[in-house]
Amino acid sequence: MKKYYAVTGIALAVGMLCTTQLAGATQAADPSVGSLDSSNVVTEFSAQGNVEQITFKSAIKSAPMSSARSAQTSAIIPGLKNLFVSAPGSDFSLNDSSNNYIKRFTQNIAGIPVLGSSITEVLDGQGAVTSAIGAVTSATKGAFPADLAAGQAAALASATKIASAGKDASAISLVDQKAIWFDAVLIGKGATGSVAVPAYQFSFTTGFAESRVLTVAANDGAILNDRTDRKDINRVVCDANSKVIDLEASNADALLKCGKTQANKPTRIEGQAASSVADVNSVYNFLNDTASFYGANTKANDLTALIGNDEGDGLGKAMRAVVRICVTDSQNGEQCPFANAFWYNGQMTYGQGVTTDDITGHELTHGVTEKTNGLVYANESGAINESMSDVFGEFIDLSNGSSDDTAANRWAIGEGSSLGVIRSMKDPGKYGEPAIYKGSNWKPTATNPNDNNDQGGVHSNSGVGNKLAFLITDGQTFNGQTVTGIGIAKAAQLYWAAQRQLTANATYSSLGKALNSACSANVSNNVAGTTAANCTQVANAIKAVGIK
């Protein structure tokens, strides 16, 4: 079955305190701080004993920062990789500096990236580093074959055979392949003490709105990870007019696409007058509301450039959407109207009547998350992924002046849609979701996340993150903590800065630390008028939901 990341329904930096030594593994040397003064360093650990955050008592202004570090500074500060106990031979490349006070680096070993790795530096207003959050591998085992290309070709043949099993060969298309170092901990699937092994990662399109990502060990061809993705949610809007798509047909993916040369032709494109189809106009307007909110309240800048798609039809890279789609498959039969919406491969797809502002913002934020930190869609990182989509979806809903923004609907997800209200961020328990970490309604971590356990409770456990966002924004006395809200403008910038810091395998503990760090950075950089008093309220909210 295909996976819907629909509107319905992580340990960081491995190895600092690890005592497990795998045979043949190359371990990191004793973590000298290099050019950093160890007396200036405060190290925080996760519950599993891994390095989670480095804070400097005095901001680091030493070389190579003779002057304030600019957005173009591409080198990690000397000694920081040792503090995170990076594997020998590691170097770090800058992969994001779109936010002037947050810099995100990827770990590489011998020039090959480590999947899921990152070290994020947080800078003050003068460009000095105040803290860092990281997820790195501390050791490697094995080596890539001397003939890298030949090894990759052999692994591709194996991966293609697996991806093609039970599928029409015409539906399988390779979209990306690369050599990587694979450490299961960094994608939330391994135990403390694991090491990085040489591997190849292959991404295939395997059917309707579906992709499959296979990671193959370079040394023995073992399958290290097998993931099927479908992200449930530019301005090019196409109308399917209740056309039924067989999800199991070999050409279903092509039948979904929106563009002049695609199966679904544009009904309304940028600058055109309103359509006679209400859902087309709703989506056209809400795509704009989402892009405008991100542009005004985050450093994401151009949302079209970040998550848009170019179908080669002369309309360029655009935020594309198909409305009024119907679907059928062998398990659920025909669904018309299709009571859902989803994001996949730069395009939004909606069933009739689910074209609301919060659902649009929710699903497009899955695209933003995919392009920023790539939160793994399982267990706690998956719950944070879902919560981030609810948070920004509701921020957009509460800020665009829509007629249904009543007091009763504030913090409700799905109001005005054919689904009705499906979640309450203010009161998650009303819909069977937890408001406190590992409290009532919490779904346990799954050792084998799959559709039967909601990938480890990604929709249910998002309630903790949703309650947290409500508390930070509006405030409330809850679970022994009194929180004064800081408002949407400050909260949106706070969550955006935290989004930039989170690693792919983030836990709720990681989210709490990232929010505290982001708040301090926003004060130092005078973002949205954030104050130290606001940060006290953020800390109180984090305590209230039990994630610190």
UniProtKB/Swiss-Prot annotation:
Family: Belongs to the peptidase M4 family.
One Gene Ontology CC term in the entry: extracellular region
Induction (free text): Expression of the hemolysin is modulated by the availability of iron.
Location of the active site: 363, 459
Cell location: Secreted, Cell wall
EC id: 3.4.24.-
Name under which the protein is recorded: Zinc metalloproteinase
Gene3D superfamilies, alphabetized: 3.10.170.10, Neutral Protease Domain 2 (1.10.390.10)
UniProt feature, compositional bias: Polar residues: 442-459
InterPro entries membership: Peptidase_M4, Peptidase_M4/M1_CTD_sf, Peptidase_M4_C_domain, Peptidase_M4_domain, Zinc_Metalloprotease_M4
CDD domains assigned to the protein according to its UniProt record, in alphabetical order: M4_TLP
Biological function: Zinc metalloprotease with hemolytic properties.
Influence of temperature on activity: Hemolytic activity is observed from 6 to 37 degrees Celsius for mammalian erythrocytes.
A Pfam family of this chain: Peptidase_M4
